[in-house]
């Protein structure tokens, strides 16, 4: 702020200039478009309380240049006098100027209102600062009335005492205040497009401005102007927000396009020559290749903004210009980077094209890298140059090395070659090359060997979502992430197998303590590694490895060698050896026999070692085996790992159906694969061997039932095998339940307890509560395929228990278990020739022996010999053709009207199954065994006074009637299809 005083900052006004200012002030007004003048006028109008040098009369014409500011900007002569005002109005008068001297006004009318000034503040010494803002005192002062408007504050500015001025009239103040508001509202009206358009239409001008979506105002009053201004502000806020969102989205998209362009530049560098991607530093218009580099240049808009960018900003790259120019034609922004699945043919072609394009790129990059290395290995240039190569090895120092003479070198070489050191080194190198080469050849065979190619009929087993195989695969995939098993790639697997082999050899030579000291493996790391490898090896042998190969089996068996020894790991390693060396070469060849012999020897060694370790461990030791595996370990390895079981174990490991490659004569072993109670590969081995032992025991029982000289010995062997099969089978698997139900059928001791255990393993009946049914079904570990046969066998055991309790006088059974009920169950046993299994056949066959041997019961009955069924044969045939299966039950009631066990029907059903059904071939039945069964059934019925031949005729007639019914049904179905075809042809 300028301070009063006499100096160079003050300017004096001549009377001529003052007269010219007064004469021009009557006809001038402030232009609306001049923002500077308007701001000055606004400042003067809002400071009317500080101006003391004006007359009180409001309507008087201005006599000084200070009255010019009170003219309304909307006056009619405002625009016409704007130029004159800008030319003649002196900008040297400060807005803070309040009290001019008396000599400043030529008229002298204001002498009574202004007190005389001192000499040093006269007309000759008065100065005004050009374009100075308001003083801090005047700007911060509030509006005052009455005696407060005495102008006493101006004394500090001019340092002179002024006389108090006369008060201004109130209407003048209000008029100027309203003029100020009207002017600002007029500016606000001109700032809103809709109001500006309405104003121009009212004045007769055409509205050329864009209203930006805002409707024009109907009446230009202050309220409408303010409301429209508020509406326009909200409209601008919404549009600004939308523009910000679009700007953000475009920035994100531009960033994505830059990333895509960088990726394409990186990928294109492998197929293009280095000169294509080289950017010249001399040309400023060149740019790096981008995703839009292939597009043609489209002429850009020749607007001033695009052709002449603002000065001082970073120049837009040409790649971005081409990208923006090509956007309207090729629409690159509309294409999504998310690639959806295409058709198989197109995807296969594109995949093959990508593979073909990658291989030359790799070769080209390798060749370029080789050239660069050779260029770096070149000799040093003779010319002096400041260029530096990429090779950091100081090869130029080799030129300074002085080589010995050729005579000395040849003599030293001959001396070294004749020494024993050279012979030892050469022998070691030859042996190493031989071993490594042999190992490499063996690994090539192991990597490419796949037993799936050896089988003619190969059907992939169906993948069940909730099967145990899926859980094993998840366990395998989880464990290999830590132990570092690579994918099925040649060099990766070769490296890992070789490293595991050296690790195994080094650990065997050094021992765990020295090995851990050398490698730095801690005890906690070793525990985690051991646990992970245990899970991985067991999951692989149980079929969890989907990419299994013999090289991976070698990898896991070497890893198993690095684990601490325990009985279970030794048993698993024995099975691992048999699976790894199973079927090496064609069956019957020398490689096949030698590999099996070597595998048996290794497995036998591991098995015996596990047996010794388990015998030395206490019962509560963490490494002690479960009861079923401990029982299995007591048996010889060659007796457990027979060819049939090893074939099924290999099929399980290689993800094949377990019955593939077998002789199809041991159907009891097929259920192990679908049994959810089998938790590991050793459990599967125990279940297979238990089922194999149970099947052999049942076949031995059929042979011993004929009553030969060795019958008693065979029965004892049979009972011991049944008990051993029960002890070996893992609980609660299907093999264990089968052995348990056979114990309940054949053994009188603890029969009721065994029946209760079998019933607990079976799901409840459908008539029970749904909640109990669902829980029992989920908790039951029995597969669905074995539930029917176990139910029939346990029913036979219950019938045998009832008859045994009647013979011995035992009253421990419930009162509802009567002999009549047992006979009713026996007569209604389901003996379907197609669905009957070996387990059901053995249970019914033994029950037939129990009932036929009860002579006292047959003698005490009303009729020991039932009537012949031949008299009812014709009625049965007629009823079978009409009523079907309902008539079959009626025929049985006609044959045996008395509550007697229908021994003839059961015996004839068993004989028919042994003769004609195809199921016995799956269980190892021979022709001699079939003859033994026929003879035994016939003799049992003859002892009871029943002729099996009559029932056999009925059985044959029944089978013929069933065949006739089936043929009639097929014929009726064919007629219906023919009639349907005729109807369709008629309609067409």
Curated annotation (Swiss-Prot):
Ranges annotated as biased composition (Polar residues): 267-291
SMART domains, per the entry: HLH
Ranges for region Disordered: 53-85, 108-169, 267-313, 866-900
Coiled-coil zones: 226-260
bHLH domain residues: 165-236
Gene Ontology cellular component terms for the protein in this record: chromatin; endoplasmic reticulum membrane; nuclear envelope; nucleus
SUPFAM superfamilies: HLH, helix-loop-helix DNA-binding domain
Region (Basic motif): 165-178
Cell compartments where the protein resides: Endoplasmic reticulum membrane
Example GO biological process: cellular response to hypoxia
Segments passing through the bilayer: 428-447
Region described as Helix-loop-helix motif: 179-236
InterPro entries: bHLH_dom, HLH_DNA-bd_sf, Regulatory_TF_Diverse, Sre1_C
Origin superkingdom: Eukaryota
Disrupted gene: phenotype observed: Impairs growth in a hypoxic environment and subsequent virulence in two distinct murine models of invasive pulmonary aspergillosis (IPA). Decreases the expression of erg11A/cyp51A in response to fluconazole and voriconazole. Also impairs growth during iron starvation due to iron shortage. Affects the expression of at least 87 genes including genes involved in sterol biosynthesis and hyphal morphology. Leads to high susceptibility to azoles such as fluconazole and voriconazole.
UniProt keyword Acetylation present: no
Keyword Transmembrane helix: yes
Keywords: Coiled coil, Endoplasmic reticulum, Membrane, Nucleus, Transcription, Transcription regulation, Transmembrane, Transmembrane helix
Induction profile: Expression is inducedd under iron starvation conditions and hypoxia.
Main function: Precursor of the transcription factor srbA, which is embedded in the endoplasmic reticulum membrane. Low oxygen or sterol conditions promote processing of this form, releasing the transcription factor form that translocates into the nucleus and activates transcription of genes required for adaptation to anaerobic growth.
Protein name as catalogued: Transcription regulator srbA precursor
Name of encoding gene: srbA
């Amino acid at each position: 702020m300028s301070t009063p005083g006499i100096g160079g900052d003050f300017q004096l006004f001549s009377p001529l200039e003052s007269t010219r200012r007064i004469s021009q002030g009557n006809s001038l007004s402030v232009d609306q478009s001049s923002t500077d003048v308007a701001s000055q006028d606004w400042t003067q109008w809002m400071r009317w309380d500080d101006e003391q040098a004006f007359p009180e009369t409001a309507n008087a014409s201005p006599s000084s240049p200070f009255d010019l500011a009170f003219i309304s900007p909307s006056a009619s002569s405002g625009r016409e006098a704007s130029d004159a005002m800008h030319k003649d109005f002196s900008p040297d008068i400060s807005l803070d100027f309040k009290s001019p001297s008396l000599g400043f006004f030529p008229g002298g009318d204001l002498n009574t209102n202004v007190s005389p000034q001192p000499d040093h503040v006269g007309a000759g010494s008065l100065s005004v600062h050009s374009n100075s803002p308001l003083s801090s005192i005047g700007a911060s002062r509030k509006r005052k009335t009455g005696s407060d408007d005495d102008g006493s504050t101006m004394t500090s500015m001019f340092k002179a005492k002024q006389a108090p001025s006369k008060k201004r009239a109130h209407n003048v103040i209000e008029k100027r205040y309203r003029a100020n508001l009207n002017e600002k509202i007029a500016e606000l009206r001109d700032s809103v497009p809709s109001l500006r358009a309405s104003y121009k239409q009212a004045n007769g001008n055409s509205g050329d401005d864009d209203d930006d979506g805002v409707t024009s105002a109907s009446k230009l009053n202050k309220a409408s102007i303010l409301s429209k201004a508020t509406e326009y502000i909200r409209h601008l806020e919404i549009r600004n927000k939308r523009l910000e969102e679009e700007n953000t989205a475009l920035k994100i998209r531009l960033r994505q396009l830059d990333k895509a362009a960088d990726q394409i530049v990186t990928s294109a560098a492998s197929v293009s020559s280095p000169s294509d991607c080289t950017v010249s530093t001399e040309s400023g218009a060149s740019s790096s290749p981008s995703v839009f580099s292939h597009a043609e240049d489209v002429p850009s808009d020749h607007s001033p903004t695009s052709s002449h960018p603002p000065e001082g900003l970073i120049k837009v790259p040409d790649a971005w210009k081409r990208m923006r120019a090509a956007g309207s034609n090729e629409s690159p922004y509309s294409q999504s980077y998310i690639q959806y699945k295409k058709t198989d043919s197109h995807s296969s072609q594109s995949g093959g094209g990508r593979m073909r394009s990658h291989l030359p790129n790799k070769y080209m990059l390798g060749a370029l890298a080789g050239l660069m290395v050779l260029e770096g290995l070149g000799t040093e240039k003779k010319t002096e140059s400041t260029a530096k190569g990429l090779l950091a090895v100081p090869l130029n120092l080799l030129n300074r090395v002085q080589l010995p003479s050729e005579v000395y070198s040849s003599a030293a070489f001959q001396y070294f070659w004749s020494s024993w050191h050279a012979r030892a080194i050469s022998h070691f190198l030859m042996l190493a090359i031989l071993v490594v080469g042999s190992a490499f050849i063996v690994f090539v065979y192991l990597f490419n060997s796949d037993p799936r190619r050896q089988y003619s009929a190969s059907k992939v087993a169906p993948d069940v979502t909730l099967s145990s195989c899926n859980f094993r695969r998840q366990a395998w995939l989880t464990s290999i992430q830590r132990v570092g098993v690579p994918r099925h790639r040649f060099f990766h697997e070769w490296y890992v197998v070789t490293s595991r082999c050296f690790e195994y050899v080094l650990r065997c030579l050094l021992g765990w303590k020295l090995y851990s000291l050398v490698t730095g493996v801690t005890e906690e790391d070793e525990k985690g590694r051991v646990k992970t490898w245990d899970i991985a090896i067991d999951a692989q042998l149980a079929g969890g490895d989907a990419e299994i190969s013999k090289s991976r089996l070698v990898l896991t068996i070497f890893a198993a060698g690095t684990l601490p020894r325990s009985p279970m790991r030794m048993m698993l390693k024995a099975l691992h050896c048999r699976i790894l060396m199973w079927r090496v070469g064609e069956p019957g060849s020398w490689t096949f026999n030698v590999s099996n012999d070597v595998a048996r020897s290794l497995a036998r060694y591991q098995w015996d070692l596990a047996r010794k370790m388990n015998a030395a461990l206490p019962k509560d030791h963490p490494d002690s085996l479960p009861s079923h595996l401990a029982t299995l370990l007591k048996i010889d390895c060659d007796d457990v790992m027979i060819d049939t079981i090893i074939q099924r174990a290999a099929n399980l490991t290689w993800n094949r159906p377990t019955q593939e490659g077998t002789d199809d004569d041991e159907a009891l072993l097929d259920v192990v694969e679908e049994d959810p109670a089998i938790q590991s590969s050793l459990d599967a081995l125990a279940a297979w061997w238990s089922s194999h032992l149970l099947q052999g025991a049942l076949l031995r029982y059929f042979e011993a039932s004929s009553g030969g000289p060795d019958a008693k010995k065979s029965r004892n062997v049979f009972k011991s095998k049944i008990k051993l099969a029960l002890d070996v089978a893992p609980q609660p698997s299907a093999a264990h339940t089968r052995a348990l139900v056979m114990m309940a059928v054949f053994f009188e001791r603890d029969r009721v307890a065994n029946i209760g255990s079998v019933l607990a393993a079976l799901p409840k009946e459908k008539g029970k509560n749904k909640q109990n049914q669902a829980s029992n079904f989920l908790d039951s570990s029995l597969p669905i395929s074995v539930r029917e046969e176990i139910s029939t066998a346990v029913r036979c055991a219950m019938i045998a228990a009832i008859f045994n309790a009647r013979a011995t006088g035992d009253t421990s059974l419930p009162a509802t278990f009567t002999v009549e009920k047992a006979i009713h169950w026996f007569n209604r046993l389901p003996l379907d020739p197609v669905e009957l299994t070996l387990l059901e056949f053995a249970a019914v066959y033994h029950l037939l022996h129990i009932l036929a041997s009860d002579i006292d019961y047959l003698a005490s009955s009303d009729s020991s010999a039932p009537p012949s069924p031949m008299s009812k044969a014709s009625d049965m045939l007629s009823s079978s053709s009409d009523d079907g299966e309902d008539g079959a039950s009626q025929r049985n009631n006609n044959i045996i009207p008395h509550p007697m066990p229908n021994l003839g029907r059961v015996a004839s059903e068993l004989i028919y199954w042994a003769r004609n059904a195809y199921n016995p071939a799956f269980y190892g039945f021979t022709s001699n065994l079939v003859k033994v069964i026929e003879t035994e059934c016939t003799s049992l019925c003859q002892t009871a006074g029943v002729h099996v031949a009559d029932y056999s005729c009925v059985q044959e007639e029944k089978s013929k009637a069933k065949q006739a019914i089936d043929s009639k049904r097929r014929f009726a179905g064919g007629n219906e299809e023919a009639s349907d075809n005729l109807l369709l042809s008629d309609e067409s």
